[in-house]
Amino acid sequence: MFYWIALLVASCLAGCRSHSGETDMQTRMRTEIVTNVRDSVLPFWMDYAVAPDSGFYGTVLRNGTPVVDAPRGGVLNARILWSFSAAYRTFKDEAYLKLADKSQRYFIDTFIDKEHGGVYWLVNPDGEVLNASKYTYAMTYAIYGLAEHYLATGNSESLDMAVGLYHTLEEKGREPQYDGYVESFTEDWKQLDNYDNNASKTMNAHLHVLEAYTLLYQCWKDDGLRKRLKFCAELFMDRIYDSSRRHFNLFFDNAWNSLVEMDSYGHDVEAGWLLCEAARVLEDRQLMDRANRLALDVTDACLVEGLSDKGYMMYEKKGGRTTGHASWWGQIETMIACVNAWQISGNDVYLQSADTVWTFVKDCMIDREYGEWYSDCFDGEPKKDTPKVSMWRC
């Protein structure tokens, strides 16, 4: 249900017009995407992911069978909170509101560390903490989900919790010498030594700081938050983005030295449109102009290098070798980025690219038997044994 992004695609298409009025392609895509979200994606989660206790299952198989004893992740549950909150804010369906409120209560009661601050990484179905490590990634999704719940419902507890997590991340998650946010910590916020690729800072963690702070600023017009949001946006443009390659670097040490040269097409296009959204929310014209130029640049590069002849965005390139499978989230981010590029430029080629990817999704990634989407496709064939609900799959 991380397909909440599809809701954003639909919103973009609904709220934007070409120079000659709404196109047939716009109307068709918007209708098809909203229908898929409401008739296939959300019902799967409503029917199969809701546990009889106060929470949500940590793993659900393709056919809707829950793994009842599976651990439950903080990121998954923050995404569930965002998803039903956003669904209610978009469609005003009381069934979505009920699950948004349920997920808000469960998340606050189960995943917020009342002693040390922050968000637990993993609990068991009874709510006992299995992994109390603190990850910037989980913190940002918690802020994101709680802020969306506030926007959807006006629930002040959600805003208070989101603001509290923001302060915790600023106080304990920032790296003091070179600034930015460290990837992960112990339960009591001591910096760890063992990181993937030896990277204490990652593009992905900062991407979701940018995303979360953008949404929080829509709820809470705080000067300190504004400064940190602008810092994150400029950090992406000035330090994380490699203009010579037209891609974002992914892994860094504390001093912001890039450690691995690889390109993640999904993260690239996601960063482009999120930068535009941040600049728009900040109402900073100079930043907006920079973000728009960068978004077009990186979207163009990814479409040239990563869009396969079958119509999907490939996964990544490392050491000159492109990994050619289609991931669920990469396709959605590509559609969003193409619609964003179309909005910026007015060039219908970008809208056509979005439709090309959507056509691939309809043909290869939507599960017509059980609902929802497959997680991955290889050579145009879906991988059918991957759970539809898991720690990383929402």
Regions found by a protein language model. Name each.
Residues 1-5:
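Bacterial N-terminal signal peptides that target proteins for export
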Residues 12-15:
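C-terminal motif of bacterial Sec signal peptides marking the signal peptidase cleavage site
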